[in-house]
C-alpha cells in the first residue's frame, strides 16, 4: 500500500462476476477469454494506483473496488506510454447466509488476465474450495500484536 499513490476517481457501476455459482470458472468466445457465468451490475469505487518506484513494470492501474465485498473484480493496467496493456478479471464465490462466520467472506475462484500487447490470455482456476483458517480472538491478538510483528528488529 505504501509503495503506491492512491487516488479516488469516482463511483461507477460495472458488470462483473461477483458470485460464481459453478464449481470452477468456465470461459468461452474467441480465444476463450470471456467468463461464462452470470454477470451482475456492481457498485464500485474507481481508484487509480501509481507506483512510487520508477522501475515498476507498469505506469498505473485502475482498480474497481466492489462497494459491498471490497473485492476487486476488474483491474486495468497501463504501460509506461499510458496505453491499456492488461485487463484482469477476478472471480469470487459468495457463501450462503447459513454458513459459519469463518466461511462468510467471498472466496477467490479464479482470474482471467488478457494481455492486449501479446494478444493472449491467462486463465487461472481454483480446483478446490478456498480454506478459511479458524482462530479464536485470543490467538489473533497474540499472532498480530504489534510487539510480535516488530520482534527481532
Give names to the regions the model predicted.
Residues 1, 40-137:
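Gly/Pro-enriched, hydrophobic low-complexity segments
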Residues 1-42, 138-153:
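Flexible, processing/modification-adjacent segments and terminal tails
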Amino acid at each position: 500500500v505504501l509503495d503506491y499513490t492512491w487516488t479516488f476517481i469516482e463511483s461507477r457501476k460495472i458488470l462483473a462476476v461477483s458470485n460464481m455459482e459453478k464449481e470452477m470458472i468456465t470461459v468461452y468466445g474467441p480465444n476463450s477469454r470471456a467468463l461464462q457465468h452470470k454477470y451482475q451490475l456492481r457498485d464500485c469505487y474507481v481508484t487509480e494506483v501509481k507506483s512510487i518506484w520508477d522501475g515498476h513494470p507498469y505506469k498505473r492501474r485502475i482498480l474497481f473496488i466492489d462497494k459491498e465485498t471490497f473485492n476487486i473484480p476488474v483491474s486495468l493496467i497501463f504501460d509506461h506510454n499510458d496505453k491499456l496493456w492488461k485487463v484482469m478479471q477476478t472471480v469470487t464465490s459468495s457463501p450462503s447466509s447459513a454458513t459459519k462466520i469463518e466461511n462468510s467472506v467471498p472466496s477467490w475462484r479464479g482470474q482471467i488476465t488478457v494481455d492486449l500487447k501479446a494478444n493472449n490470455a491467462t486463465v487461472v482456476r481454483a480446483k478446490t474450495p478456498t480454506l478459511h483458517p479458524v482462530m479464536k480472538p485470543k490467538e489473533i491478538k497474540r499472532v498480530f500484536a504489534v510487539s510480535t510483528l516488530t520482534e527481532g528488529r
